[in-house]
Amino acid sequence: MSSDPSPSTTVVPLASLAPGSRGVVTEIRIPAHQRGRLLEMGMLVGTTLELVRFAPLGDPVEVRLRGYNLSLRKHEADLVLVRPL
């Protein structure tokens, strides 16, 4: 029996997804005073999103969710945990 978690239970930082990959937000570890901005833009636990691309130097990260594209700093994307689809 393998001890590797199945893909459906694996949780990874948003910034670790490859461009074109999708995931479901499971946790947002951004401090409360910054988290409100993301919540207002629709990034909630349970939201399905797609990592669109990284800027040429890797920062920012462009994400598609709820019908629009959102750019996040890489350090913010590292604090959003997703379950890859």
Regions found by a protein language model. Give the residues of each.
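Amphipathic, hydrophobic secondary-structure cores in small proteins
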Residues: 19-75
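Extended boundary segments
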Residues: 1-17, 76-81, 85
